[in-house]
Protein backbone atom coordinates (compact mmCIF):
# COMPACT_ATOMS: atom_id res chain seq x y z
CA UNK A 1 0.00 0.00 0.00
CA UNK A 2 2.81 2.43 0.82
CA UNK A 3 4.48 1.79 -2.54
CA UNK A 4 1.23 2.60 -4.43
CA UNK A 5 0.73 5.75 -2.34
CA UNK A 6 4.28 6.94 -3.07
CA UNK A 7 3.87 6.26 -6.80
CA UNK A 8 0.56 8.16 -6.79
CA UNK A 9 2.24 11.09 -5.01
CA UNK A 10 5.03 11.08 -7.59
CA UNK A 11 2.55 11.11 -10.49
CA UNK A 12 0.58 13.96 -8.90
CA UNK A 13 3.77 15.94 -8.47
CA UNK A 14 4.40 15.66 -12.22
CA UNK A 15 0.92 16.82 -13.26
CA UNK A 16 1.00 20.26 -14.92
CA UNK A 17 -0.68 22.90 -12.75
CA UNK A 18 -1.20 25.43 -15.52
CA UNK A 19 1.23 27.93 -14.01
CA UNK A 20 4.79 27.60 -15.23
CA UNK A 21 7.90 29.45 -14.27
CA UNK A 22 9.07 31.55 -17.23
CA UNK A 23 12.73 32.01 -18.03
CA UNK A 24 14.21 34.53 -20.37
CA UNK A 25 17.05 36.74 -21.37
CA UNK A 26 16.93 40.49 -21.02
CA UNK A 27 18.81 42.52 -23.63
CA UNK A 28 17.91 46.17 -23.79
CA UNK A 29 18.92 49.77 -24.20
CA UNK A 30 18.15 52.57 -21.79
CA UNK A 31 18.74 56.34 -21.88
CA UNK A 32 18.92 58.33 -18.66
CA UNK A 33 18.47 62.07 -18.21
CA UNK A 34 20.54 64.41 -16.10
CA UNK A 35 20.15 63.51 -12.40
CA UNK A 36 17.02 65.15 -10.96
CA UNK A 37 18.54 65.20 -7.51
CA UNK A 38 22.26 65.25 -6.88
CA UNK A 39 23.53 65.92 -3.36
CA UNK A 40 27.32 66.18 -3.09
CA UNK A 41 29.30 66.13 0.17
CA UNK A 42 33.09 66.56 0.23
CA UNK A 43 34.79 63.99 2.46
CA UNK A 44 37.72 66.30 3.31
CA UNK A 45 40.62 63.85 3.16
CA UNK A 46 41.57 64.87 -0.41
CA UNK A 47 40.28 67.56 -2.78
CA UNK A 48 38.61 65.09 -5.18
CA UNK A 49 37.00 62.72 -2.64
CA UNK A 50 33.21 63.23 -2.52
CA UNK A 51 30.12 61.24 -1.64
CA UNK A 52 26.94 61.76 -3.65
CA UNK A 53 23.30 60.76 -3.45
CA UNK A 54 21.53 60.93 -6.82
CA UNK A 55 18.25 60.04 -8.53
CA UNK A 56 17.83 59.70 -12.28
CA UNK A 57 14.90 58.93 -14.61
CA UNK A 58 15.55 56.55 -17.50
CA UNK A 59 13.62 55.44 -20.58
CA UNK A 60 14.00 52.04 -22.25
CA UNK A 61 14.07 51.93 -26.06
CA UNK A 62 14.53 48.14 -26.22
CA UNK A 63 13.89 45.28 -23.83
CA UNK A 64 11.09 43.15 -22.48
CA UNK A 65 10.37 40.78 -19.62
CA UNK A 66 8.22 37.84 -20.63
CA UNK A 67 6.96 39.75 -23.68
CA UNK A 68 6.02 42.82 -21.60
CA UNK A 69 7.99 45.85 -22.88
CA UNK A 70 10.13 47.68 -20.32
CA UNK A 71 9.11 51.38 -20.37
CA UNK A 72 10.98 53.37 -17.78
CA UNK A 73 13.04 53.17 -14.61
CA UNK A 74 13.96 55.46 -11.73
CA UNK A 75 17.36 54.78 -10.18
CA UNK A 76 18.46 56.10 -6.79
CA UNK A 77 22.11 55.58 -5.89
CA UNK A 78 25.12 56.62 -3.84
CA UNK A 79 28.61 57.18 -5.20
CA UNK A 80 32.00 57.34 -3.49
CA UNK A 81 34.26 59.23 -5.94
CA UNK A 82 38.01 59.70 -5.67
CA UNK A 83 41.03 59.48 -7.95
CA UNK A 84 39.14 59.27 -11.24
CA UNK A 85 36.86 56.43 -10.14
CA UNK A 86 33.44 56.31 -8.52
CA UNK A 87 32.13 53.24 -6.73
CA UNK A 88 28.36 53.22 -7.06
CA UNK A 89 25.54 51.35 -5.37
CA UNK A 90 21.81 51.76 -5.73
CA UNK A 91 18.30 50.60 -6.42
CA UNK A 92 15.94 50.89 -9.36
CA UNK A 93 12.18 50.72 -9.79
CA UNK A 94 11.09 49.99 -13.34
CA UNK A 95 7.69 49.98 -15.03
CA UNK A 96 6.54 47.54 -17.70
CA UNK A 97 4.01 48.43 -20.44
CA UNK A 98 1.35 46.54 -18.43
CA UNK A 99 1.94 48.83 -15.44
CA UNK A 100 3.61 46.07 -13.41
CA UNK A 101 6.81 47.05 -11.64
CA UNK A 102 10.17 45.36 -11.06
CA UNK A 103 12.80 46.18 -8.46
CA UNK A 104 16.57 45.91 -8.85
CA UNK A 105 19.70 46.41 -6.81
CA UNK A 106 22.96 47.34 -8.54
CA UNK A 107 26.58 48.14 -7.85
CA UNK A 108 29.37 49.18 -10.15
CA UNK A 109 32.18 51.50 -11.07
CA UNK A 110 32.21 54.76 -13.03
CA UNK A 111 35.32 56.17 -14.71
CA UNK A 112 35.64 59.93 -14.22
CA UNK A 113 37.55 62.69 -15.95
CA UNK A 114 37.90 65.18 -13.13
CA UNK A 115 34.43 65.01 -11.60
CA UNK A 116 32.69 64.28 -14.91
CA UNK A 117 31.51 60.70 -15.56
CA UNK A 118 32.80 59.14 -18.80
CA UNK A 119 31.82 55.45 -18.71
CA UNK A 120 30.47 52.90 -16.26
CA UNK A 121 29.81 49.23 -15.75
CA UNK A 122 27.70 47.45 -13.18
CA UNK A 123 26.19 44.21 -11.98
CA UNK A 124 22.50 44.11 -11.09
CA UNK A 125 19.94 41.69 -9.70
CA UNK A 126 16.17 41.61 -9.43
CA UNK A 127 14.85 41.91 -5.86
CA UNK A 128 11.12 41.62 -6.60
CA UNK A 129 8.21 43.15 -8.40
CA UNK A 130 4.43 43.48 -8.72
CA UNK A 131 1.85 41.77 -10.92
CA UNK A 132 3.51 39.51 -13.50
CA UNK A 133 6.90 40.56 -12.13
CA UNK A 134 6.07 39.48 -8.57
CA UNK A 135 8.68 36.97 -7.44
CA UNK A 136 11.01 37.72 -10.37
CA UNK A 137 14.64 36.71 -9.89
CA UNK A 138 17.72 37.04 -12.04
CA UNK A 139 20.83 39.08 -12.61
CA UNK A 140 22.95 40.71 -15.27
CA UNK A 141 25.33 43.45 -16.30
CA UNK A 142 25.17 46.98 -17.65
CA UNK A 143 27.58 49.23 -19.53
CA UNK A 144 27.07 52.95 -19.88
CA UNK A 145 28.54 55.99 -21.57
CA UNK A 146 27.98 59.59 -20.49
CA UNK A 147 27.43 62.69 -22.61
CA UNK A 148 28.72 66.21 -21.80
CA UNK A 149 25.16 67.25 -20.80
CA UNK A 150 25.17 64.53 -18.06
CA UNK A 151 22.71 62.26 -19.90
CA UNK A 152 23.77 58.64 -20.36
CA UNK A 153 23.13 55.60 -22.58
CA UNK A 154 23.14 52.03 -21.26
CA UNK A 155 23.30 48.50 -22.67
CA UNK A 156 21.65 46.02 -20.32
CA UNK A 157 22.02 42.23 -20.43
CA UNK A 158 20.89 39.49 -18.11
CA UNK A 159 18.68 36.51 -17.38
CA UNK A 160 15.51 36.20 -15.34
CA UNK A 161 12.91 33.78 -14.02
CA UNK A 162 9.36 34.75 -13.16
CA UNK A 163 7.46 32.99 -10.39
CA UNK A 164 4.76 30.47 -11.31
Question: Across the structure, where does each feature detected by a protein language model lie?
Answer:
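N-terminal signal peptide c-region/cleavage motif recognized by signal peptidases
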Residues: 15-19
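Bacterial N-terminal signal peptides that target proteins for export
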Residues: 1-7
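Beta-strand-enriched cores of mature, soluble protein domains
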Residues: 21-164
Amino acid sequence: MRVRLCIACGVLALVHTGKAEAQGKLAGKMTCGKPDQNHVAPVGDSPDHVLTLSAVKCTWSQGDIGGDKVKDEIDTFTSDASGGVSRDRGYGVGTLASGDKYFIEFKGKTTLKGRTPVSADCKWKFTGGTGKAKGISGKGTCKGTFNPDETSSWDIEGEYKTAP
